[in-house]
Amino acid sequence: MKPVVLVALLWLWPSSFLAYPTATVLPDEEQNLNHYVQILQNLIMSVPTKEQGFGRKFRSSRTVDGAEARSLSSEMLLTPGLVSAQEVTTPETEVMLTSMVEKTTFPSSGFTMESEKRRTHSKAFWSIQPNNVSIVLHTEEPYIEKEPEPEPELETEEESRRLATEPEPEPESESAPETETRQTAESEEEVETSTAQNKVRTGTSRMSTVITQTTNTQGTPNTVTVKTINNLDVSTESEDVPQLSGQSEILNVEDLPGHHSLSTRHENILRKISNINSQIHQGLLSDHSSPAYKEFIKASREHLKRSLALAAAAEHKLQQMYGSNVFLDGHTSDPDDDMEVIINMLYNSRSKLSDYFTINHVPSELREKATVVIAVLKKILCVDQVEMQSLIRKLLSNNMKILNILNVP
């Protein structure tokens, strides 16, 4: 019987009493827990998310009455395994909960049907992982005062006249412009440090700032004007930065039209010189005792001697040609020498005479002279049309006589 009774008791005994033993919570502990929960709730509400509408819906869904907030806070504090809210509520806890509800930032308004329909479930704060990118922490941004825009010169003149007529401001009004001038000096130092990193200096520009501030001291408005003019070295790192309107543009040699072709020619010449230099060094490093190397040296020396002799002869001929009076109008020295020079010149340039006597290939400044020369040569070398016809007739008659003699039908 005893085993049967024990089995029945174990079957009827509630499982919650065995798994979760009861525990009592002291008022001090409950107060501390409520305080920590309130801090955590404020932290969660202060963390903004990417979706602004979600935060608004979350705030609207958290609007509860005093009694409902008290019940919700007590349910959040006590887990179902420890104790219920009715068993622990004491006068001290009620006072603490009411004060906590009054301190909360939630507006005291009841639930509505739309808020219940649109209520969204937020993620618990203890389940947020550190690497969750959807949560953006909001840092307190420093307040940056914007510099006022410079006013026209007419207003500054009127303000200077007004300052001359009005009494001097008190030290309190002078402290505010000093702080603003310090801010402008700091901004100018930042501009100088940022421009110091650039490479090319383009020029200097003057920057002037006019700061005005109105202060009411003893019921009378006083206007303080502070004008600072500084010279700042403005530099640009690349050509993408636009030039200021007042600066003069610096012409670059590379922008000229013929500079590109000249630079390419110079580069080609330098490349050829470097190739020749490398070949010379390679020849010097080879064996000097080889017979092929000695023959190559002798042939190169003879070739150089010939080229130098030809260059000297050509230079001598040019000096003679330029020294003669052939090209002067109406003045001739020795006709035999002049004829020799001209015939030799035409003979040496016989391969290019067709290019020299075509008007399209002649430069514009020499076309008049070229036309005169070509006309004279045509008169000398070519025959008139009448003479051409007579010559053709003679040739035809001679051909007919030859055919008659040969009895060719």
Swiss-Prot record:
Residues 1-18 form the signal peptide. GO terms for biological process: acrosome reaction; fertilization; fusion of sperm to egg plasma membrane involved in single fertilization; sperm-egg recognition. Residues 167-177 have a biased composition (Acidic residues). It is found in: Cytoplasmic vesicle, Secretory vesicle, Acrosome. Keywords: Cytoplasmic vesicle, Developmental protein, Glycoprotein, Signal. The keyword Mitochondrion does not apply. Residues 141-223 are annotated as: Disordered. Its main location: cytoplasm. The keyword Signal applies. Glycosylated. In testis there are two predominant forms of 77- and 67-kDa and a form of 47-kDa, whereas in epididymal sperm from caput, corpus, and cauda there are two forms of 47- and 43-kDa. Testis forms contain complex carbohydrate residues. Epididymal sperm forms are N-glycosylated. Then undergoes significant glycosylation in the testis and that the majority of these glycoconjugates are removed by the time sperm reach the caput epididymis. GO terms for cellular component: acrosomal vesicle. Residues 209-223 have a biased composition (Low complexity). Glycans are attached at N132. Residues 198-208 have a biased composition (Polar residues). Belongs to the SPESP1 family. Involved in fertilization ability of sperm. This is Sperm equatorial segment protein 1. It comes from Rattus norvegicus (Rat).
